[in-house]
Amino acid sequence: MSAPRLSVIVPVYNGRLQLPRCLEALRVSEFADFEVLVVDDCSTDNTREIAERFGARYLRTPRNLGPGGGRNLGAAHARGEVLIFVDADVVVAPETLDFFAEDFQKQRDVSAVFGSYDESPAWPDFLSQYKNLMHYYVHQTSSERAVTFWAGCGAIRADVFRRLGGFDTDKYPDPSIEDIELGYRISMAGGNILLDKRVQVKHLKKWTVRGLLRADIWLRAIPWTRLILETRNLPLDLNLTHSAQLSAGLVGLLMLGLLLLPSVLAGFFNSWISLPVLTAAVAVIILLLLMLNLRVYAWFVARRGVLFTAGAVLVHWSYYFYSGCVFALCFLEHLLRPHREAALGAPRNNLPAGMAG
């Protein structure tokens, strides 16, 4: 059986600094039978000139649609049997397309495939290194049989993508969890999703504290929690393992203990908790957190040293804290929604008197 023809779709918005590296990597790919479609989401720079210089098919959205809308537009014009989505700030390896083609050629029951970032992030600063390395570790240690999808570098059979309607840009107009939600639909439709750990790509993004918090909380944690509650589907993989859930709860208890510490030192609450008991409880929680996450912290020590890992632990526990808070608040919102909808009742008729049907 011959390898499938591939269509590589690259959504981009003002990507003049990163798009050339992305397209150059595709141009020197070891795989031969593929096309590249650059979907320009109303950029104001020279994106078109860059795309045409590298021989890519150029498409432009009628208005700003976000990456999900750009991918959908590219898919509508693609000629390949397999659609490969590559972010404009991603550099594929020479063998990346070969791996995708091989997966779909040899495993006819596979509907979608995705990979991970590599362990050599482009930017040397701590936050960019940590964020991309944590992504690499989570994907590389997760099950190969996934129930979600990742569009940073992921592929879907064209017929499956079109049958399911592509990315839901009505629900997720901004870059969010539109890829995860599509993965849910693929899985619920009976499709198989493969996490191919050979597919590793370089991420060119430089992370900032503000950008990380916005992405982690507003663009990921909140919509993903709502999706989990709506579908009642909590996949115990990637960032949602039992140990991750338990760690989030423990970090919440740790924060509570640290908040109580000044009051206990001042003599408050002595009737029901003493300083030695609180100190011991905090120490036990810290020990449990270190034990639960020992593998990833040992992995960081081996690759970046003790000092880097100490910072990684603090950022990791911060992630557990705000993710746990988001889940708790969204769960409360989910519980209260039926009561709120019942209180609102039927919609009012605002037509003038005598005009109602």
Give the residues covered by each predicted segment.
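A conserved acidic beta->alpha catalytic loop
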Residues: 25, 32, 40-48, 63, ...
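Conserved donor NDP-sugar-binding/catalytic core segment of glycosyltransferases
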Residues: 91, 95-127, 204
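Short, flexible, basic/aromatic active-site loop/helix in glycosyltransferases
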Residues: 112-117, 128-148
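Catalytic donor/gating beta->alpha subdomain of glycosyltransferases that bind UDP-sugars
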Residues: 168, 173-237
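Membrane-embedded multi-pass helical conduit in multi-pass membrane proteins
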Residues: 249-328, 332
